[in-house]
Amino acid sequence: MRAVGVGGSPRADLRHTIDSLTSQPEFRNAHWGVLIVNPRTGDTLYSKNAGKLFMPASNMKIITSAAALALLGPDYTYKTTFLADGPVGDSLLDGNLLVIGRGDPTISDNMRGLATVVMDSLADSVRAHGIRQVSGALARVGNAFPDSTHGYGWEWDDLGEYYGSGVDELIFNEGMAPTTLRPPPDSVRDSLYSGPAKDPGTGYLNAFNDALTRKQILVEAGVMDSILPTPIKMDTLFTYTSPPMRNILPALMKPSQNQIAEILLKTIGLERGGMGTADSARKIVGQQLLSWGVQPDGFIIRDGSGLSRHDLLTPETIVKVLDKMQADTAFAVFYNAMPIAGVDGTLKDRMKGTPAEGNVRAKTGSISAARSLSGYVTTADGERLIFSILANNWSTPSSAVTGVADQIAAALAAYRTH
């Protein structure tokens, strides 16, 4: 449906356009929440169910990313420590090679091009300490993220998918692991697939052990599946520092990467609450939202990514956070991490050929019966607007819901405030 203005003021025409789009007969049973504001003037250009709670899907990542910038900062880095619990001499580490992680999510193909290259560099660092053989095992020490590796309320159907893999203080390739499927005897070759690792921490150690093998370093006892109790004596070999938060957020926001979001949530709990659990983090993020002026009944946080159907946000909450981020010293990091309509990320193929292309910076969201689009748009006369569009529970094809959100965003890009 093409919405047509009624010939009144620009604001009246905009309201008519959005009302027409969201009240089409096919959306008779759908729930829409829309809020559009001009942050410079404080004007509300459009509001529909803006104070109602909706499943936000991946718009929850707006909250997680904003809180991470506010509470951890754009220069925050993750540190992974590599240690020995025995002496090193004559090329032998007479003991275990230990790893203490704190959640570094950056050793992945998505962030580094080829994650094994990073692992090889870590193995080179072990080799630089004169180690060619480890008499014991490769093991992890510490338990920075002691709760479940999956988010609260994640559905069973999601857990076997790439976007539903778990996270831990050690994680390689976003918790994915290669899996070889053996074919029938008459087939030519095996098939190699990638699926969620049963245990992300062990998956990391397996990948690191593979790198050690490539560098001709033998770990005699292999990988220890369980967490090793902290030895009385350990010597630090080296510490690996991740790229900073300013580099991590685009890898989270543009492709809508669930595992990075969950790690950031737990990191907030670890760094600001002393406990790397989702429960600890939810309280801290909630306090941050309240400090920004969000209404206490405007949010329910259950995970960091929005994959949980127990997450609830209002359009008012999202717009408030987007507005507050404009005053943050790291706003450029936040703004540039968002997908750009028609250009990249989850918006690469949307709004092409419209005034929104190359203009709208917004976070998408998509789970069953929930679609969302919230962010920033610059109008035809140069005003930056903030908008949030949430939709839940419809029976029409989901593409129709996404299409309405895109049409609203395009209308905002073409809008003239006066």
Regions found by a protein language model. Give the residues of each.
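Extracytoplasmic
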Residues: 29-31, 49-51, 57-60, 75-77, ...
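Mid-domain, small-residue-enriched loop/turn segments at the edges of structured enzyme/sensor domains
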Residues: 31-32, 90-171, 175, 269-317
